[in-house]
Amino acid sequence: MLYEKFEHNINNLIGGFGLSKIAIAVSGGSDSVALLYLANIWAKKNNIELFVLSVDHNLRDQSKQEIEYIQNTANDLGLKFYSLFFDHQNNFSNLQERARKGRYDLMTSLCQKLDILVLLTAHHEDDYIENFCLRLERKSGVFGLSSSSVNWHNNTQIIRPLFNIPKSELVNYLATNNIKWFEDQSNLSTKYRRNTIRQKLAKEEVYIKDDIITQQIKVNELIENKFKPELISAIAESVKISEYGFAFLDLIKFSGFSQEVRVQLINFLLIIISGQQRSARFYSVEPILKLIRQSLDFKNTLHGCVIKRMQNKLLIYREFGKKLPESKLLLDKQLVWDNRFRITKNHNIENCVATYLSLEDYKIIKEKLDLEVLKNLSCGNHNAILFTLPIVKILEKVVAIPHISYYDNDIKSFNVSFAPDFTSRFTHFY
């Protein structure tokens, strides 16, 4: 039966955590509504408080009806309900990806406020099949083709207990129990590649899906048993990440790793140093690997980073390009700047802005800067890296560059730590 399969999955995924409360993402579609009812049975059985979270993207006319239905259903089940709103700001560029990130940002931020460690989502077997086909079409490497029923976002564990359950079983469960759900009409639109793949798969014989599932399982086993342990060892042996927000890669050790791990290792460093959430495509990393194999020094840019070879070392540091980091007002004690640096204010100082060092600011204060430590650590690349570090300004005046201990008075009013907002399912321990 469906519930027994669900119970087996969720107990294996989080049964030993001893949690007292869990959140669940519900959209109103058949997948998440089925998950809501299944999770409610399990939560009551295990004396766990369930919190229902729903995000209104304000993109469809029926979204308000869906939110109202989910709220009423949660109330009927005796569950706490939270409605969140994603503001797309009338910017429809790359909307699916932005909405996905915004949705997870909103839900995991609320989980942190509610002291909830786990968020359940309704990704089912058909979703995994579609993802595999999409990634295969995009020529993803073996790491990109792999999947997991456990992920992380914003230090919240994302659990997918329906990973081996087909959508048809979820729909049948709802229909049998006379439970209402909503159909998202955008799922029929062929302007989204995923929908086209879904429609093609629906016409295929069952054995085609079974073959894809078998391939997915083999890839996952290969990652778990071979490449994931190698990647963790590779990071420990060959990578040095500096508090100044740059990294060195030992190319002699790097040459001894498998091709799959070399690609993932470069991607790992690009994400950490750039502060971006998503990895670079395999086809964009491959030219860098070719340059490395040529054993010649080079300097290139990729994924918001400068990649520079110096003999047997590869230096990677931030590159802003035309997209400069947002300046942020230090209203609270702490903030994260450029998704990489955590700035702490030690004293109650007003009108503080965290931003980047401009050339004009540098010209004013350059005679007062001591860059010797940064110069030694970065093998002479201190000038370039200096302009990637956070500074603090008050009324347009640079008052602090904490990394190089520059302050315009004797009070050390600010501290900075390198804390990129990134968690990888390949390197995260839980």
From Swiss-Prot:
GO molecular function, one term: ATP binding
E.C. no: 6.3.4.19
Keyword Cell membrane: no
Pfam families per UniProt: ATP_bind_3 (PF01171)
Family, per entry: Belongs to the tRNA(Ile)-lysidine synthase family.
Comment text on domains: The N-terminal region contains the highly conserved SGGXDS motif, predicted to be a P-loop motif involved in ATP binding.
Protein known as: tRNA(Ile)-lysidine synthase
Organism: Rickettsia bellii (strain RML369-C)
Gene encoding the protein: tilS
